[in-house]
Each structure stands twice: as structure tokens, then as C-alpha cells.
């Protein structure tokens, strides 16, 4: 129920009627003059995808009832992301995170589609971003926040989804203050179609700070999302890394 259709005069393109299906799935127009018309779905029922394929109908004699049928596909919304990285690191070493399965798995387009990496700022400093590539041609941008500025700023813009970039994201490249560092960055695509997904895998390179204590651990969180019909569709992935702790020598007990 509640699927809406608009009926247009075929020749003039004028809207002549708007109809809505009842509980039985049937919608009936008011009596229309003889002629040719185009029926277009304008609003799908809840949990179903919109199909704007026009249906041509013709009323050839007075009182004629013209029947048409349309089947909508059930709507499915889902996004995904998976993040992995090193299990164990040493203070001061470089750390790489790998991303897989970044996708809009929905049967419909999503707006404001993004994926984001929230860095464990107490443990790492962002160095480089390998962007990866995606299966649909388009442009996107990368924005970031820092410990001194909670507003998003543009890191790189007008990037192509079909080109793989290695981007310098170090504090010096971005002109950050001496005590400023990136706490999160977001890759923002805008509108993406259903089945939009990564091809080459994105990777993020960070430097582990030198003052971490052996035996501690830190968590990096990535998330992905997009909007359908005013609702956010989201997913999250986390990865835990330990800081290596050298084995303490056993006390000598003999000679």
C-alpha cells in the first residue's frame, strides 16, 4: 500500500492525475478522456525500491478500463567496512592499517556516503594515506579533524575514484602547528549507487609514538555510512594493537 503513481498526458507531458495504492495493492485513477498516457511511479511503499520506468497506456473508447501491473523489488540497505593492522608494534615504528569490504551493499543509492578512520591519538600519528580505488567513476574529498580543531578541514579535494593516490598526511605537509596532530579523517563521496565498493584496498600509514609503555594496547576504529530516506545506514570495525614488551631477564640464582 501507499505506492504513488503520476499519470501524464503522453503528448503534452501535463500531469493529469496522482493515484495511490490501497491495502490490496490496487490504485484507480479518475475517469480520463480518450488518449494516450504515461504512468510513472513517484513514491515507493516503505521497504521497497522506487522504479521510475514509465508505463504507456491508451484509452481507446469511453468507459474502457485499462489495467497495468508493476512489481517493486524489496529494498535492502547495508554498508560494510573491515579494518585490520599489525597485532603488535614497537614504540617508534611505522604501523599500517588495511581496509577491506568498503561498500554500499544496498539495492539503492545512498547520499552523504563516507568512510572514516578515528585514530588512537594517544598512540599514533598519521603519516600517509593510500586511497585505493572504487568501481564507479566519480570524485571525492578527504577532510580531517585535529586535537586543536574539531571542525572538518579539507585535506585533499577532487580525487578520482578510479585512480590510486599515495597522499602525504604528515603534519608538515598539512601545515599543522607544532603541537597539533590529526585525530580523525573522513573520505567523503556524496551520492553513490547501490553496489558501490572498493577495488584496490586503501591503506593508512601511521608512526607509533616513542613514549608508549610496553604491554599496553590501543584501538583504532573505522566506520562507514550513508543516508537513505533520511536515515543513516552505518557499520563499524575496530582493530586492537598491543605494544611489545620485552621479556624481563630472570634473576640469576646460581654461579
Please report, for each region that a protein language model flagged, where it lies by residue.
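Solvent-exposed loop/turn and edge beta-strand elements of beta-rich ligand-binding domains
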Residues: 1-255
